[in-house]
Design a protein with these regions (language model features):
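Helical hinge/lid and interdomain linker segments adjacent to catalytic or ligand-binding clefts
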Residues: 101, 424-521, 539, 565, ...
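Internal amphipathic alpha-helical repeat/solenoid segments
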Residues: 56-82, 98-115, 440-451, 669-677
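An acidic, glycine-rich "communication" segment
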Residues: 506-599, 603, 613-616, 628-633, ...
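Aromatic-Pro/Gly-enriched surface loop or interdomain linker
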Residues: 368-462, 466-470, 569, 577-688, ...
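An alpha-helical repeat/solenoid feature that recognizes helix-turn-helix modules
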Residues: 27-51, 66-101, 112-148, 152-200, ...
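Bacterial N-terminal signal peptides
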Residues: 7-20
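Signal peptide processing junction and immediate N-terminal pro/mature segment
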Residues: 18-30
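Structural recognition of the beta-strand scaffold that forms the well-ordered cores
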Residues: 88, 123-125, 150-151, 177, ...
């Protein structure tokens, strides 16, 4: 067998000898994309994945259910490598484990006992992915056997780990080593026990073999062969940084020296790989380029792994997933495969199953919804302009010294671990990710850019903040203007986001800083202790208020928008030894800390999956200038006379509703609504009134008569019960019915039917249908069977609206299930109400009815 054939065969089995020459300088980041471009790219990526999946399925159907070819299967003894890669790509693209194509590929793999590192690794990864998705552990013995193979075939010299190679070859290489590590971690996630010593040896290996960049003291890289004299390898540097991240993730116990009783770490923020990882990330960011090495597609997959494992949205200054998607979709062929452009080199050129699988892994895994964003903050240095590191941020301490342990990131795996636990406990194993959110090098000089940034952050339903010391962006109480980070966090919460914060190691300076932040962005609001009746204690069993007596919360309008723990939690989240085997029966305080995170996430998300990455929320800008007399303008009734209430609940609901009507129904609307008490003499100017209720209604006779007069002269009142605990929800519901009975003694609220008594379509539904609004069914969370709370998940129901009719016209329309909080974007698993899309449809139909009638 010729050396060239061997090289091609091995490279095609995921990357042997994919070594780059000297890296090219990173290109400047592209200008921000327009809002419509974001939506277009989301659609393009989805279509591209669908076409790629079809291509792989069609290829397997023509090849007896697998993807092997003569070269890899017979000539280089790598049977199963291509099939495992294709199965992995299909599973990550949404194919079910029991689909005929995936089942056929898995059956093929189960018959094999591979003896090459790449194939053993890929077989392990494919079988582990299938096990996690199906929860069927039949392949666990085979996965465990593969772990034994890795442990047996690792190369050591003088007691030190040197990596993996091909059986019989005593010289290890970083490509084989990288895939051995991927296989080992996949096995661990599937449930195979791997001793911490092996992970520490791997950490030591990557730290020891990193080379110092002679051009930049802040950067370090890796080679393909540590014994060789070749230059830096970009692809192996990406693999080296991934190796450090994975080895740290594999450890059951970190080296932070955690006190399990208190949650305080004696060595908080100290990691043996801190410096090596920082140097590796610096090198990769400064030299970022997708078109590196002998296989660009292999490089795409490496970059995807690094971006996802590190949680970084930006590598250097490159928005890696967005930029990679834009490039990859252009490389897709009419048959759904992915191929190089005609003039591009590539050792895997002409092998579309390999290139297509790598492309799908990039597109699909990178698209994984972001559940939690970890908020980066603190002092920093920018790279020198004109130098290779101009796109890189260097962390520093408050005293100005450079640090590899920034105050916001003293725990490296806390966010990753709570997301993985929530994925298992709440979302039935659906793929989820986390990311670091770092705005510090972004150009946020205009309101439009700030709004765009908030729109991106909203793809993640939770923002997680923790650390040591005060956050420098929190301005003084005497400052009238909010800092840019304060503006972003305020708008994020107003648009439906949720804040989870924790004082790392119980740090009092951070606790005081976070409380000051909330006081700045929501004046008049204050953190309070979470009461025993709060829904987070009952989302899942296993914890109670006695376990976390100091836990704090902040309510705003419809619901709780922030949870803060002044006592340590992140130290437990950092270590997988506290990962509960049974989330309903935690054994110690560390396991209870994981269960608390689960319950908070369940509450904050309403147990709804986040939208895929790249999904951007377009914010409604504030209206500038005066309101034209011709514009339709809505009114919100503020019926609570309590002077401490600054605004009615769901105060942004009408703004979002008007923006929706302006876009979808082409109405000429005013985005700014009026807020008036029921007694206001101006009430008759507004023929659409909205009442969103949390507290019981007690209209005075004057207020009741004033509302009634408006209704009798063409007005319409839409009312709904806001998100609330079920006892308060029932109190409001009854108070509204009583108020309507006093207002209209001869009538009472009745269910609005879809048909009139003479069999015609009810005008409300007819007008909705004519406008293209489907009111046939909605997604709603109603009372549970016991009547003690809300259903755990949203369900599909017929629309449930009640009303009062005068002279053939509905003048009051009432939903006992929330509409306003949903339109604001709030999700809460204890809320009896609709999802946002359903709420917008219902409210839009009622507005159109009020205009047409």
């Amino acid at each position: 067998m010729t050396r060239s054939l061997l090289a091609v065969g091995l490279a095609l089995c995921v990357g042997v000898l994919l070594v780059s020459s000297s890296p090219t300088t990173a290109q400047p980041a592209a200008p921000p994309k327009a809002a419509n471009a974001d939506g277009e790219l989301v659609g393009k990526v989805k279509d591209s994945i669908d076409k790629g999946v079809k291509y792989l399925k069609d290829t397997a159907a023509k090849n007896n259910g697998h993807w092997e070819g003569v070269v890899l299967k017979s000539l280089v003894d790598m049977d199963g490598g291509t099939t495992a890669l294709a199965v992995l790509a299909l599973l990550n693209s949404g194919e079910k484990v029991d689909s005929p194509t995936v089942k056929g590929g898995l059956d093929y793999l189960r018959k094999l006992t591979p003896a090459k590192t790449y194939v053993v690794a890929l077989q392990t990864m494919a079988l582990s992915e299938a096990l996690i998705l199906s929860r069927d552990k039949k392949d666990l013995p085979k996965i465990a056997k593969n772990v034994e193979w890795f442990e047996k075939n690792v190369i050591r010299r003088g007691g030190k780990l040197e990596g993996w190679s091909y059986p019989g070859n005593a010289i290890a290489d970083n490509s084989n080593t990288q895939y051995a590590l991927l296989g080992l971690y996949a096995a661990k996630t599937a449930g195979v026990k791997i001793e911490d010593k092996l992970w520490k040896d791997i950490q030591d290996y990557y730290t020891r073999t990193q080379k110092q960049d002679k051009l930049n003291p802040k950067a370090g890289y890796w080679l393909y062969h540590n014994a060789g004299g070749e230059g830096p390898s970009y692809t192996m540097s990406v693999g080296g940084a991934c190796g450090l991240l994975i080895a740290n993730m594999g450890l059951d116990m970190s080296e932070q020296d955690l006190n399990a009783a208190t949650g305080v770490a004696a060595k908080c923020g100290i990691y043996p790989d801190n410096i090596a990882l920082a140097k590796g990330m610096f090198y990769i960011g400064a030299n970022f380029n997708f078109e590196q090495g002998k296989s660009y597609f292999y490089n795409y997959y490496g970059i995807e792994r690094l971006g996802r494992l590190s949680g970084q949205r930006f590598i250097g200054k490159m928005d890696w997933y967005r930029e990679g998607c834009e490039k990859l979709v252009k490389l897709q062929q009419p048959d759904g495969s992915f191929a190089y452009s005609s003039d591009a080199p590539g050792i895997d050129k002409g092998y579309p199953t390999i290139t297509s699988s790598f492309a799908l892994l990039y597109l699909s895994k990178g698209r994984t919804p972001v559940l939690v964003s970890k908020f980066a903050w603190g002092n920093y240095l920018k790279g020198e302009v004109g130098k290779q590191d101009q796109a890189i941020l260097t962390e520093r301490n408050p005293d100005g010294t450079i640090t590899d342990a920034p105050n916001w990131n003293r725990k490296h795996s806390d966010c990753r671990n709570i997301v993985e636990f929530a994925q298992r406990e709440i979302f039935d194993g659906a793929p989820l990710s986390w990311q670091v959110y770092d705005m510090r090098l972004q150009d946020l000089s205009t309101q439009a850019k700030i709004d765009s940034e908030v729109g991106l952050l909203l793809q993640s339903p939770l923002v997680y903040m923790n650390g040591h010391g005060s956050m420098p962006f929190v301005t003084r109480p005497t400052d009238t203007a909010l800092s840019v980070p304060e503006q972003i966090l305020k708008r994020y919460v107003e648009e439906g986001g949720f804040l989870l914060a924790e004082a790392c190691c119980g740090n009092k300076d951070f606790a005081a800083s976070f409380e000051e932040l909330l006081a700045r962005i929501f004046p008049g609001s204050a953190l309070k202790k979470v009461p025993p009746e709060h829904a987070i204690w009952t989302m899942f069993p296993g914890i109670g208020p006695g376990d976390f007596p100091d836990l704090m919360y902040l309510d705003r309008g419809c619901r709780t928008v922030a949870i803060f723990s002044p006592r340590p939690l992140a130290g437990y989240w950092e270590e997988r030894r506290f990962f509960p085997v049974d989330g309903r029966d935690p054994k110690n305080h560390g396991e209870k800390a994981f269960c608390l995170a689960r319950n908070i996430i369940a509450y904050a998300t309403g147990m709804e999956l986040p939208k895929p990455k790249l999904t951007k929320t377009i914010l409604v800008p504030p209206e500038k200038g005066g309101i034209a007399r011709s514009k339709f303008r809505a009114l919100q009734l503020k019926y609570i006379s309590d002077a401490s209430v600054q605004q009615p609940p769901a105060s942004d609901a009408l703004r979002n509703l008007m923006a929706y009507l302006g876009q979808h129904a082409k109405l000429d609307v005013a985005l700014t609504s009026e807020v008036l008490p029921p007694s206001a003499v101006q009430l008759t100017k507004y023929k659409f009134m909205y009442l969103h209720g949390r507290k019981p209604i007690t209209f005075t006779v004057e207020e009741s008569d004033n509302i009634k007069a408006n209704l009798q002269t063409g007005g319409l009142l839409l009312a709904d019960a806001a998100c609330n605990d079920i006892k308060q929800w029932k109190v409001f519901d009854q108070s509204f019915r009583d108020a309507m009975l006093k207002m209209f003694p001869d009538q009472k609220l009745v269910v609005i039917p879809t048909r009139t008594p003479d069999g015609k379509e009810e005008p409300l539904y007819k007008i909705a249908s004519q406008a293209g609004i489907n009111l046939g069914s909605v997604e709603c969370r109603r009372e549970n069977a016991e009547g003690t709370g809300a259903e755990k998940k949203l369900r599909t129901y017929p629309v449930m609206l009640e009303g009062i009719k005068i002279d053939g016209r509905w003048v009051v329309i009432y939903s006992r299930y929330d509409i306003g909080c949903a339109i604001e974007g709030h999700k809460s698993a204890d809320c009896l109400g609709h999802d946002k899309e359903s709420a917008l449809r219902i409210a839009s139909a009622i507005v159109l009815y009020s205009l047409r009638r």
